[in-house]
Amino acid sequence: MTNTRKSHPLMKILNHSFIDLPTPPNISSWWNFGSLLGACLAVQIITGLFLAMHYTADTMTAFSSVTHICRDVNYGWIIRYMHANGASMFFTCLFIHVGRGLYYGSFTLTETWNIGIILLFSVMATAFMGYVLPWGQMSFWGATVITNLLSAIPYIGTNLVEWIWGGFSVDKATLTRFFAFHFILPFIISALVMVHLLFLHETGSNNPLGLKSNSDKIPFHPYYTIKDLLGLLLLLMLLMMLVLFHPDLLGDPDNYSPANPLNTPPHIKPEWYFLFAYAILRSIPNKLGGVLALATSILILAIIPMLQTTKQQSMVFRPLSQTLFWILVSDLFILTWIGGQPVEYPFIIIGQSASILYFSLILILMPTANLIENNMLKW
C-alpha cells in the first residue's frame, strides 16, 4: 500500500518540501534562519490578526485604540509587544539570512536570490507602514519624512506624494490606506515565500563548502526538522525575554505621545532596522542623490551575482574576502549607530565615510579581492 504522504496530492507537495527533501549533509546553523523567518512571519500574521480585531484606523481613535489593547484587552499587552518586537526579530533573522547568502555565495542561485530581494523590499514596506499605525509622534513624523522623499523624483514627485497621502498632508486617508496595505502585504509575502522555496528546491540548497552535494544528500526530516526546532526554541526564548523584560528597549519614547502635526520631535528617526539606510540617505546633501543612494543601498544586492569574479563559490577558503566581508558587517553596524545620532559634527563625516566604504566594498574591493585570490591560486 502506498504511503499517504507520497500519494495524496497535497501531502505530496509538503513531503517533497519538508520531509523527503534531499538536503546537503553539512549545512550549518546559518541555514536555520530561513525556517526562523517563516516562524517570524507566522507569529506576525497571528498577532497582527488579533491586533486588527481591536485597532481602529482613524486619526482620532488610533492612538487610544492601541492604549485600549494594552490596558483592557485580555493579554492585549503581550500580543502588542510580541508584534512590535517580533518585527525586530524578523529583521535580525533577515539580515543574518542575507549575510549568510553573501558569505557562502548563495546568490549564484539567481532566481531564489532575486525573489529574496523582492521579499526584503516587501517586508521593509510592511514594517514601515506598521510603524505608522499607532499614530504616535514618531509614527506621524516618520511617515511624513519618508513619504516626502518621493517628492525628489523629477516632474511627478509632488503629485506622487499627494497621491500616496490621499491629500495635502499625512492624515486620515493616509492612515486608512496604510492599515489596508499593512494587513494585505503579509499574505502577499507568504505567497512570495512559496515562490522563493519553489526556486530553491529546483536547484537544491547551497552548503558551507560551496561544492555540489548531489552525490551525498540526506532527507530533511528528521535531521533538519530537529535542528530547526532548536533554532525556533532559542528564537522564541529571545523574543519572550524581550517582550516580558524589556518591551520598549527597541522602541522610541516619542511614540508614546499622540501624533501632533504642530510639534516636530527633535530627532526624527525610523526603527533601528532602517537606520543603516537612513544614515546613507542623510550622508548625501542633495535630496535626489540621497534618495537614489537609499534605494541603491538595497538594490545593490541584485547586481552582486554579476560582480562575482571568483572561481570558488564560498568564502570559507578565501581569507581576503572574509576580511572584507567582516569589515562590511562592521560598517553596517557603524551606519546603524550613525542613523540614530543627530545631524552634527562628527556624526556627519563618520556617516559619509561609512557610506563611501559600504559602496566601495561591494562594488570595488570585494570583486578585486576575488581576482587577487584567483591569481594566488593560479586559477
UniProtKB/Swiss-Prot annotation:
Principal subcellular localisation of the protein: mitochondrion
Annotated signal peptide: none
Places the protein is found: Mitochondrion inner membrane
Keywords from the named record: Electron transport, Heme, Iron, Membrane, Metal-binding, Mitochondrion, Mitochondrion inner membrane, Respiratory chain, Transmembrane, Transmembrane helix, Transport, Ubiquinone
CDD domains named among the record's database cross-references: cytochrome_b_C, Cytochrome_b_N
Cited Pfam families: Cytochrom_B_C, Cytochrome_B
Textual note on the cofactor: Binds 2 heme b groups non-covalently.
GO biological process, any: mitochondrial electron transport, ubiquinol to cytochrome c
Cofactor(s) needed: heme b
InterPro entries documented for this protein: Cyt_b/b6_C, Cyt_b/b6_C_sf, Cyt_b/b6_N, Cytb/b6-like_sf, Cytochrome_b, Cytochrome_b_C_euk/bac, Cytochrome_b_N_euk/bac, Di-haem_cyt_TM
Residue numbers binding a ubiquinone: 201
GO cellular component, one term: mitochondrial inner membrane
A molecular-function term among this protein's GO annotations: ubiquinol-cytochrome-c reductase activity
Residues bound to heme b b562: 83, 182
TM ranges: 33-53, 77-98, 113-133, 178-198, 226-246, 288-308, 320-340, 347-367
Binding site for heme b b566: 97, 196
Membrane topology: Multi-pass membrane protein
Description of how the protein assembles with itself and partners: The cytochrome bc1 complex contains 11 subunits: 3 respiratory subunits (MT-CYB, CYC1 and UQCRFS1), 2 core proteins (UQCRC1 and UQCRC2) and 6 low-molecular weight proteins (UQCRH/QCR6, UQCRB/QCR7, UQCRQ/QCR8, UQCR10/QCR9, UQCR11/QCR10 and a cleavage product of UQCRFS1). This cytochrome bc1 complex then forms a dimer.
Note: Heme 1 (or BL or b562) is low-potential and absorbs at about 562 nm, and heme 2 (or BH or b566) is high-potential and absorbs at about 566 nm.
General function of this protein: Component of the ubiquinol-cytochrome c reductase complex (complex III or cytochrome b-c1 complex) that is part of the mitochondrial respiratory chain. The b-c1 complex mediates electron transfer from ubiquinol to cytochrome c. Contributes to the generation of a proton gradient across the mitochondrial membrane that is then used for ATP synthesis.
Protein family according to the UniProt entry: Belongs to the cytochrome b family.
Protein name: Cytochrome b
Gene giving rise to this polypeptide: MT-CYB
